[in-house]
UniProtKB/Swiss-Prot annotation:
Binds the 23S rRNA. This is Large ribosomal subunit protein bL31. Part of the 50S ribosomal subunit. One of its GO terms (molecular function) is rRNA binding. Keywords: Ribonucleoprotein, Ribosomal protein, RNA-binding, rRNA-binding. Belongs to the bacterial ribosomal protein bL31 family. Type A subfamily. GO terms for cellular component: ribonucleoprotein complex; ribosome. GO terms for biological process: translation. PROSITE patterns: RIBOSOMAL_L31 (PS01143). InterPro entries: Ribosomal_bL28/bL31-like_sf, Ribosomal_bL31, Ribosomal_bL31_A, Ribosomal_bL31_sf.
Length: 83
């Protein structure tokens, strides 16, 4: 038997609300739960996700910070000047 007056009120039919629309009911300690995203409007679950061009972003970073591949002409010119 649980101790009296220490447990929250249980709502077996709590409404989950997204954008002003009831999307599902569940059990919770609050009568209404307001959410911004749920599986019905999340891009991953709806199949409308945008695929980023990660290769282009990496190349842009490498060029910006000088971590890209070195030119062969520059290496041979340095070697000739040292000799």
């Amino acid at each position: 038997m649980p101790k009296p007056d220490i447990h929250p009120t249980w709502y077996p039919d709590a409404k989950v609300i997204c954008n002003g629309e009831v999307v599902m009911t569940t059990g919770a300690t609050q009568p209404e739960i307001h959410v911004d995203v749920w599986s019905g409007n999340h891009p991953f679950f709806t199949g409308t996700q945008k695929i980023l061009d990660t290769e282009g972003r990496v190349d842009r970073f490498m060029k910006k910070y000088g971590m890209g591949t070195k030119k062969k002409g520059a290496d041979s010119a340095k070697a000739e000047s040292k000799a």
